[in-house]
Amino acid sequence: IISYFFTALLIIQSYSCSSDKNKVTPPNLVVFIADDVSWDDLGCYGNEYVQSPNIDLLASEGIIFKNAYLTTSSCSPSRNSIISGRYPHNTGAAELHTMPPIEMISLPEILKSNGYFTLQAGKFHMGDYAIRGFDEVHDDREVNGKGGEEYWEKAVENAPNDQPFFMWFASYDAHRAWGENQFTGTHNVDQIKVPEYLIDGPETRLDLVNYYDEITRFDHYIGEVVEKLKEK
């Protein structure tokens, strides 16, 4: 069985019941995090122009939050808050690129101490305290690819079968600078709507389609992971 929880970040939970009716196997947990993707630039949040079919499907089968907010709209402070459960002003790292204290506890560290295999793949950008919580860290771009997602499917495939796992999959998509990828051309400059707060010109439209193409790449790898989880 695979169950889903969805918000600006995405968590997939898969679990199974053992033959003992009184015992439930601990759930496997997978977290997906995009980089610099606005909440309303996904189909499930009403954007009719971006192609995000895998995320949209998960959202339709799970829970979607429509009243959730950031306290700091910045990369590393948000990551540290998500993985620690603390507000940015309580992590010691409310500013971009600042590191929390080494003694801070993270979710994967707690899970690891309770028998979970823990793995990170893609963009890290959190601090040494968070490394302590992972059995494996794969933050090399040569391994993960330009979008940070290419190792994800293999990580699931290689996950141990004799213990539950927690996987933290963080992409570089759709952070600037945008470059060509296998999904370049998915979106057309003449077939999108420019938000009212932006100047509707050729440069803006080109920026938007390049941005949308990287969202589609992120979405594609989420679909690959979901299929691999079903096989596993």
State where each predicted segment sits.
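Formylglycine-dependent sulfatase
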Residues: 6, 15-232
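Sec-dependent signal peptide recognition
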Residues: 1-8
